Amino acid sequence: MDYYYCPSLLKLLRYLWNQLKQCFSRRAPEAKDTDTLVQEADSQYGTWADQHQNGGSFGPESPSPDSSAASVGKQPPGSHLSSYTESTSVEQRDSSRDRRSSSVDRSSSELESTDGPEGPPPSDVCPAQEDDFSFIHQTSVLDSSALKTRVQLSKRSRRRAPISHSLRRSQFSESESRSPLEEESHSTWMFKDSTEEKSPRRDESDEEPPRVERTPVSHPQRMPVFPGMDPAVLKAQLPKRSEVDSPGDSLSWTPQPKSPKSPFHPGVLGSRVLPPSTEKEERSEECSPQWLKELKSKKRQSLYENQA
């Protein structure tokens, strides 16, 4: 049935098929259960003797719908067919009227259902379909400012290389030299909004005063080596020592083998002398001859002259 392309013909065939089904499958309204028939009196239906007395009529005196089924069972086979055809013809006439009225209603409803896609859609469906897409106009543009700030913060919080010791010392000295007011101004950066645009004039004016204040940082205050001593007294004692040492330098220099010597002399390039042990020097002086001692003393004198 799905392969027909004419909807009106399809409806007509369906209507005829339904009528045929109802004709063959409908139960007779006069038929009743056997229990109810047994309870009823036999006088209503009559007996075989009564029927012979009445002139051979095989039906009851008062035709009623309830007694028709019993009379059909008692009639002979010849009259059974005639009575059945008469009853079915009457029933079909009555039922055909009801079916026509109901079929008109059904056909009109089926025409509306089958011709739905060809004809215009009903008025109730159109506004529902339009309202389905109304949420598109209500949506607002997404605010991506929060995502931008997250990206900026993640860039700032990336791991940096460790600061060298020289930078740490300079920062430490700068923090010591700063005044408490400057520290407060530097600490308030955490409470400022980084998204606010700063004017370039303010940045220049803010950068200039710290430059002037940071100039003395390059020359830190020198701590005294001897805190208990007066520096003026120490300076007065230094020239006295130089005067005492100067006459000794003018005299012939005498070697002092027991004094320890420095392992490296910066004046002589590439010359390194190990400090001789005192025990070896004493043994060498006792065992070595006079000419060897003079030779060693000359070498020492030449080394010190080159250094001077």
UniProtKB/Swiss-Prot annotation:
Region Disordered, annotated ranges: 43-289
Phosphoprotein found in the keyword field: yes
Compositional bias per record (Polar residues), positions renumbered to this chain: 43-55, 80-90, 136-152
Residues annotated with Phosphoserine modification: 62, 166, 205, 259, 262, 288
SMART domains attached to this UniProt entry: Tankyrase_bdg_C (SM01319)
Gene name of this polypeptide: Kiaa1671
Biased amino acid composition, Basic residues: 153-168
Basic and acidic residues biased stretches: 91-109, 175-186, 193-216
PANTHER family per UniProt: RIKEN CDNA 2900026A02 GENE, TANKYRASE 1 BINDING PROTEIN
Record key words, sorted: Phosphoprotein
InterPro entries recorded: Tankyrase-bd_C (IPR032764), TNKS1BP1-like (IPR040006)
Highest taxon of source: Eukaryota
Taxon lineage: Eukaryota, Metazoa, Chordata, Craniata, Vertebrata
Name used for this protein in its record: Uncharacterized protein KIAA1671
